[in-house]
A protein has these predicted regions:
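Structural signal for interior beta-strand "rungs" in well-ordered beta-sheet cores
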Residues: 1-56, 60-61
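Terminal amphipathic alpha-helical/low-complexity segments used for targeting or macromolecular assembly
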Residues: 58-129
Length: 129
């Protein structure tokens, strides 16, 4: 995990492996940050950030998957594409997030990455960005 200068964590924050937290980021207490995710500099994380994504903006929002980080860690192009499709369904489709999660659970190939995404979202207590 990489934390740039002035990044601040509240109490009981959970951070997955290979996370990149930009400079000046403030993470609220009890927030969970999923593995391989990246938070753009200068923003505030008040809700949980699922694995494998890039988030930025005020309020913090999904920007895309952490493609470069996943490539560097050796994820296959098939795994990256599946992650991208799952998050496109969850964040970008016109469905509400409950419906989108059900589609991911029922219609997507259940790889290790998809299972981590599903488990992370279902176990979120603070909501998802």
């Amino acid at each position: 995990t990489i934390m740039a200068n002035l990044a601040t964590l509240g109490g009981h924050v959970e951070i997955g492996e290979w996370v990149n937290i930009g400079g000046g980021v403030v993470v609220h207490q009890f927030v969970k940050i999923g593995e391989q995710s990246l938070i753009g500099g200068g923003f505030c994380a008040k809700q949980d950030i699922p694995p494998y994504i890039i988030v930025a903006g005020h309020p913090l929002r999904f920007i895309g998957i952490n493609k470069i980080g996943l490539e560097r860690r050796g994820y296959s192009s098939e795994a990256r594409l599946l992650i991208k499709k799952a998050y496109r369904e969850y964040f970008i489709s016109k469905k509400n997030r409950g419906q989108a999660l059900a589609i991911i659970k029922n219609n997507f190939k259940h790889s290790e990455e998809i299972e981590k995404i599903i488990n992370f979202i279902e176990s979120s207590n603070r909501g998802i960005v």
